[in-house]
A protein has these predicted regions:
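Non-Sec secretion/translocation targeting segments of pathogen effectors
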Residues: 313-333
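Short amphipathic alpha-helix segments
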Residues: 229-242
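Charged, alpha-helical interface segments at or near domain boundaries
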Residues: 26-219
Length: 333
């Protein structure tokens, strides 16, 4: 069985033979694409009369090849993906004027150390061990939210500075993806109701039994449940929760989509950080991990900062150099 590097070369050299005749003169390339927490390798097949082509990520196709060990079958799957993605791309014609973009830019948080390569190519600013990046929301429908990461080139070509993106995104995120703080009880009850569980059964299970606020877990996300960890940047929500609980908070980054807030009386931050690390490594996919650290919110100072400092391992478990600065910085570019 060929390794992944050889697989990429074989696909690149042979894919045109598996595509329809109109692709005969297409140009083929394979290139690395920095994504959140990882780098993927994409195949592009550019038709002669087009100025863009979809990325077909080869990691997934390589998994298919490992399962069937038949390169011809896999090439046929890749070809089908190319044709389908090219058709879909032709249907999408987003308006790229500056007004449309500035009204639909939202905040997203990623881990700084794990995303060094990605951060070279995108406008960003540091926040503790994380970085704020920006996504342009192209469409929202019943299937979810379609968005793209804004790159340096994209921003420069449309006249946006990082500061302008930040200011637009702070306001837009509250409108497009309103922050939401709910107790874990409420979240579990909502999920159970969505699954059709009767109210009476939920009550008999004690789902609605009152738990003191300082003993509860609180989920900080947004109404979409997508990239909701950025909601921790809205300090007024943290302050309101801390006042309700009556103590400072520890924030546990469960994924890029949400964080869990608890009273500081719930345990030592080092213990909580170990729990976050263990969950990250066993239950959260690499592309959705945010941090192995825990954050402390001081309700009197109204300040959010790191409670722990465990940068010795990246989110993929690889030993990493410790970042030198954890304080919030100004625009990175």
């Amino acid at each position: 069985m060929m390794d992944f590097n050889m697989f990429q070369e074989v696909v690149k050299d042979n894919i045109l033979n598996s595509l329809p005749a109109e692709y005969k003169e297409a140009s083929v390339s394979v290139h690395a694409v920095p994504k959140v927490n990882r780098t993927l390798h994409a195949l592009t097949v550019m038709l002669p009369d087009r100025n863009k082509a979809p990325n077909i990520y080869l990691e997934e196709m390589y998994e298919h090849y490992q399962q069937n060990e038949d390169i011809q079958t896999t090439l046929a799957e890749v070809a089908d993906a190319v044709v389908e993605a090219t058709k879909e791309m032709s249907k999408v014609n987003p308006v790229l004027d500056a007004d449309k973009i500035q009204d639909n830019v939202v905040l997203c948080l990623v881990n700084s150390t794990q995303n060094e390569e990605l951060l070279k190519d995108v406008p960003n600013r540091r926040f503790q061990d994380l970085s704020v990046i920006y996504r342009w929301v192209v469409n929202i429908d019943r299937n979810g939210m379609q968005s793209m990461i804004i790159t340096n080139d994209f921003a420069a070509n449309r006249g946006f500075t990082e500061e302008e993106l930040f200011q637009h995104a702070v306001e837009n995120t509250k409108r497009i993806c309103p922050p939401r703080v709910k107790s874990m009880q409420e979240v579990m009850a909502d999920l159970a109701v969505e699954d059709g569980m009767p109210q009476e059964l939920l009550e008999s299970m004690g789902v609605f039994d009152e738990i003191p606020p300082e003993k509860n877990l609180w989920v900080i996300t947004n109404e979409m449940g997508i990239n909701g960890a950025a909601s921790m940047l809205y300090e007024e929500n943290l302050h309101k929760l801390a006042e309700q609980i009556g103590t400072d908070l520890y924030l546990l980054p469960s994924s890029i989509h949400e964080t869990i807030a608890v009273s500081v009386e719930m345990g030592a931050p080092e213990y909580l950080a170990q729990m976050v690390h263990d969950v990250n490594m066993t239950a959260v996919t690499l592309d959705e991990r945010l941090s192995n650290n825990v954050y402390h919110y001081d309700k009197d100072l109204r300040k959010l900062e790191l409670a722990t400092d465990v940068p010795e391992k990246g989110l993929d478990g690889v030993i990493a150099e410790p970042p030198m600065i954890y304080e919030k910085e100004g625009p990175a570019r």
